[in-house]
Amino acid sequence: MAEASIEKTQILQKYLELDQRGRIIAEYVWIDGTGNLRSKGRTLKKRITSIDQLPEWNFDGSSTNQAPGHDSDIYLKPVAYYPDPFRRGDNIVVLAACYNNDGTPNKFNHRHEAAKLFAAHKDEEIWFGLEQEYTLFDMYDDVYGWPKGGYPAPQGPYYCGVGAGKVYARDMIEAHYRACLYAGLEISGINAEVMPSQWEFQVGPCTGIDMGDQLWMARYFLHRVAEEFGIKISFHPKPLKGDWNGAGCHTNVSTKEMRQPGGMKYIEQAIEKLSKRHAEHIKLYGSDNDMRLTGRHETASMTAFSSGVANRGSSIRIPRSVAKEGYGYFEDRRPASNIDPYLVTGIMCETVCGAIDNADMTKEFERESS
C-alpha cells in the first residue's frame, strides 16, 4: 500500500486542539454529476443552531460534470447538518442540494422531486431502512487484504466472520460506525458480508426524505474515514466477476398501516403494486445492476418479479417474523449498492402510496441524460 496516501492523524491532532476563537467550520457536502460526493469547507462566525442560519454557497459545476464551462455556477442550498466527527467541537457537516442559477434543481438533484412525494403522503408515515453494502480496495485497486495476484478461500466463513483471515479492516469499520453515531445518524448496525472485504452498514428507520439525507451522509463519513486508512470504497454492485456475491442496498419499507395489527393486508397490496412497475423500478435501482441480479448469489432475476416469505432469492422478501405476526414491513432486494437513495425511496413512495400530479420519479431519473 502507498504509505504516503494515509493521513498523518497523529500530527494533525495538535492542530485540531487549537482554539477556533468563536468561529466554526462548516463542511458543505453535495452529490456531483457522477453519483459521487464532493465537499468544501467555509468559516462561519458563530455556532449554528438552525438550518435557516446556514448561508447558500456555490461551486464550479463544470468541474463536477454538473454544468457547462460558460455557465458554471451551481448553488448549494443547505438541507441538513450534523456534528462533524472529524473536527468535532461546534463544527458541522452540511448536506446541500444543488440548484442552477435560475433556481431550478440541477438535473442530478433528485432530492427535490422525491421531497414532493413525501410531503404529499406525509400522513402515510412511510419508513425506510437501507442496508448499504460496499467493498474495500487498496491503493493499487486490489481487493483489500486479498492475496496479491490470487484469491482467498471460497465464500463461506466470511459473513459475520470473526478472526484473522475471515474479516479485514475491522478497525476502519468501527471508526466509521462511531463517526455516524457521533453525528447523530440513525445507523442501526454493521456486519461483514459474504465476500471477504465486503461489509454492510444499516441506516434507519428514517421517515421520508430523511432516509436519503442520512444515507448520503453515512457514505460521506465512510469515504472520509477510509481516507485515513488508505482504503478505497467501491459501491459497484458486482466489483468482481465469478463466484462472488455482489453488493446491494436492500430497502426495507413500511407505512403506518403496515406497522399496525392486520398490516399484512397492506403489505400484500404494496407488493402487488410493485409487481406491476417492476421494469420502472429496475431502471432507477442502480447502474450495472444486471451484473448482480442474475438469480444467483442471493439475488432474484432482473427480468422477472417475485416475492416470498424469508426468500432471499426473491425480488421482495417478507421476513418470517412479519409473516408470523401479521404486520410490519417488507424488504425490496433489487436495489444495487450504488443507488441514489432519493430515486429509490421516491419511486417506492410513488408506487406504494400513489402518484401525484407534480412529481414523476421515472422522468426525474431521465433528466440526467437530457
Swiss-Prot record:
Transmembrane regions listed in the UniProt entry: none
Catalytic EC class: ligase
Main location per the UniProt record: cytoplasm
SUPFAM superfamilies: Glutamine synthetase, N-terminal domain (SSF54368), Glutamine synthetase/guanido kinase (SSF55931)
Catalytic activity field: L-glutamate + NH4(+) + ATP = L-glutamine + ADP + phosphate + H(+)
GO CC term, one of those recorded: nucleus
Positions carrying Phosphoserine: S5
Domain GS beta-grasp: 24-103
PANTHER family in the cross-refs: GLUTAMINE SYNTHETASE, GLUTAMINE SYNTHETASE 2 CYTOPLASMIC
Protein's name according to its UniProt entry: Glutamine synthetase
Organism field: Saccharomyces cerevisiae (strain ATCC 204508 / S288c) (Baker's yeast)
